[in-house]
Curated annotation (Swiss-Prot):
It comes from Xenopus tropicalis (Western clawed frog). Residues 27-114 form the Ig-like V-type domain. It is a single-pass type I membrane protein. The keyword Mitochondrion does not apply. Residues 387-433 are cytoplasmic. PANTHER family: CELL ADHESION MOLECULE 2 (PTHR45889:SF1), IG-LIKE DOMAIN-CONTAINING PROTEIN (PTHR45889). It is found in: Membrane. Keywords: Disulfide bond, Glycoprotein, Immunoglobulin domain, Membrane, Repeat, Signal, Transmembrane, Transmembrane helix. This is Cell adhesion molecule 2. PROSITE patterns: IG_LIKE. The gene is cadm2. Glycans are attached at residues 31, 41, 51, 287, 291.
Length: 433
């Protein structure tokens, strides 16, 4: 029997419709993950359905919903949507026992199914740190253990000291008796050090179920240690006649008791000048007898420590030149001398020795040079004035003994500038002696 081409075309079209219909009548589901105690939706969709029923069943093959009819009496299971193309249900307060494969069935001939795996995350319990007994002595071994149970999958534990992560740790995980969750334990071992006193050790649990903030346990370290001592002087160069304060700075835990001050291995020799106030030693007036070694000793319940300070008193520095100035001239003369001193000083700076040492010595030399210049100037002025005075009063002077002389012009007068050969004498002046 030979089929006509038209019949073949009809059979081909019918087969395509059947295949397409069979592909559109296949249920589609998705795997879901939920945190223990949460709510989840299970959805089954069919693109093309010829009024065929849909059904959801749990891992125990118990029917939950058949179309819109509830089959299992469980108040946690509710219908979300039911149609020929979709069947959606919700499960609230999910527990670990709800985990498994859920099946959506499409009742065609034969029945078509699709499976969705429900994964339930176990939330880890709050961590707890054990193994620390306060206080710990410096140098002792400290072992801290952080433990958290109920996580699924197993949680991760991380250690931090203040804000710095510690990676040298040991981790152990064990499965709980329910066969689903895990208990995670991590240990941290280190030596107690004074710098760790007051430090905060944090144990943090990281898990995919903790979407907001991680769970953290804290432990504050308390380390006891012997005191550390140092002495701080109030001045780096103590001088004779000045006061001095020595501060004894001590740190320790527990806090050190009041410090003890000694000098050269004995008590303080002069309690009137040397007073102790708390951690400070005050010497009101230094003298050479105070030289020596001062010791500050601090003690607590752990031990004792001390520091020493060697006191060497320096002499008070003396000025290189006296600073007293004796006034020699009147105010008018001082004005003139100051001007001359300025000019002389300027000249001295121009011609000063280039090898001269800088500083106060050069300044004193300039001052002395100015004073010498003023003295020389005044001396020269005095010589000039005296010379002019003598030149103007040159002549012959008669005394009382010459009154009886015959050649005396006048016994009561003295003639100045009256030489016998001078005919054109301009002026004669007489003075009584």
């Amino acid at each position: 029997m030979i089929l006509q081409p038209s019949a073949l075309l009809c059979l081909s079209s019918l087969w395509g419709v059947i295949v397409q219909a069979s592909q559109g009548q296949f249920p589609v589901t998705q795997n879901v993950t939920v945190v223990e105690g949460g709510t989840i939706n299970l959805t089954c969709r069919v693109d093309q359905n010829d009024n065929t029923s849909l059904q959801w069943s749990n891992p125990a093959q118990q029917t939950l919903y058949f179309d819109d009819k509830k089959a299992l009496r469980d108040n946690r299971i509710e219908l979300v949507r039911a149609s020929w193309h979709e069947l959606s249900i919700s499960i609230s307060d999910v527990s670990l026992s709800d985990e498994g494969q859920y099946t959506c069935s499409l009742f065609t001939m034969p029945v078509k199914t699709s499976k969705a795996y429900l994964m339930v995350l176990g939330v880890p319990e709050n961590p707890h740190i054990s193994g620390f007994t306060s206080p710990v002595m410096e140098g002792d071994t400290i072992q801290l253990t952080c433990k958290s149970s109920g996580s699924k999958p197993a949680a991760d534990i991380r250690w931090f000291k203040n804000d710095q992560e510690i990676t040298d740790v040991q981790k152990i995980q064990q499965q709980d008796s329910n066969g689903k969750t895990f208990t995670v334990t991590s240990s941290l071992v280190f030596q107690g050090d004074r710098k760790d006193d007051g430090a905060v050790i944090r144990c943090r649990v990281d898990h995919e179920s903790l979407t907001s903030t991680p769970q953290i346990a804290k432990q504050v370290l308390e380390i006891h240690y012997t005191p550390t001592v140092r002495i701080l002087p109030s001045t780096p160069l103590p001088q004779e006649g000045q006061p001095l304060i020595l501060i004894c700075e001590s740190k320790g835990k527990p806090l050190p008791e009041p410090v003890l001050w000694t000098k050269d291995g004995g008590e303080l020799p002069d309690p009137e000048r040397m007073t102790v106030n708390g951690r400070e030693l005050t010497i009101s007036f230094l003298n050479k007898t105070d030289n020596g070694t001062y010791r500050c000793e601090a003690t607590n319940s752990i031990g004792q420590s001390s520091a020493e300070y060697v006191l060497i008193i320096n002499d008070v520095p003396k000025p290189l030149f006296p600073t007293t100035i004796i006034p020699l001239f009147t105010s008018a003369t001082v004005k003139t001398n100051v001007a001359m001193s300025t000019r002389t000083t300027k000249s001295a700076f121009i011609t000063k020795d280039p090898n001269a040492l800088p500083g106060p010595v050069a300044t004193d030399h300039a001052l002395i040079g100015g004073v010498v210049a003023v003295v020389v100037f005044v001396t020269l002025c005095s010589i000039i004035l005296i010379g002019r005075y003598l030149a103007r009063h040159k002549g012959t002077y008669l005394t009382n003994e010459a009154k009886g002389a015959e050649d005396a012009p006048d016994a009561d007068t003295a003639i100045i500038n009256a030489e016998g050969s001078q005919v054109n004498a301009e002026e004669k002046k007489e003075y009584f002696i």
